[in-house]
Amino acid sequence: MLADFKDEDFDNKIRNEDVSVIQFSAAWCGPCKALKPIMDKLAVEYKDKASFYYADIEDGGINTGSAAGIRGVPTVIIYKKGVEVDRKVGGVPESHMKEFLEKNI
């Protein structure tokens, strides 16, 4: 399950964790809603390898989304100790998201 993400979590958590995965989304975004259950499932599957978060770019994740240069949602970014490693933009099937995670974490 994805933990809710707020801007202050970046300094408190993301910079200190070995691997963090953030799904940047918006409440009005259909592809974001479709990706959420996939990410929830993968968060459980990969819980020993990374921490998973859900950031609404219009509610609580505004500054982090802006700093990360989010131009479209959904965007999933993988961080290692607060440094971006890779990102995937747009809704993708579970198999593609798994490949993305395997490659980067």
Identify the meaning behind each predicted range.
Residues 24-38:
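Conserved redox-active cysteine motifs that mediate thiol-disulfide chemistry
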Residues 2-19:
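A short beta-strand-turn-helix
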